[in-house]
């Protein structure tokens, strides 16, 4: 059973992890893997920009999660990011963010759905070259971080998945934990397949 450290304990993530046979642990030392979940925006000072659209900021969380990424990677342990987690990882590797984009946030409290196009690799193996995911974000990758690769994009060019060229880092902009179990949507992919593959 894979032991996962959630940087912020959120029930829907815990439920999704339980569904695939993973277990959340209380301390980073116990964990096999770090999972950075969704949440508010990363403060732009961490990527050398002034405030210009970022909202719901928690600088203490930003600093703590950046330190956790450093801790896990130094230990050779994988790091997985979801939504904000992808954005934070891009910042960690020296990238920037678009502080506000249109067309990707929730509508009336419900995740949007849109198509993404995947490069050859894990995502294409799991879901094919073109598949539908959910969307609930208003920020996105600007300048790509050093040694990061884009694995999937939305039709408008928004980066939807990244991985590091040599380190065990993988992240998606969508929410696989909200595409499995009670949150399964017939129009979109099965999020449990991705979570299972990442935690294998």
Residue ranges of model-derived segments:
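Conserved SAM-binding loop
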Residues: 85
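N-terminal beta1-alpha1 cap of cysteine-dependent amidohydrolase-like domains
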Residues: 1-82, 91-92, 98, 102-127, ...
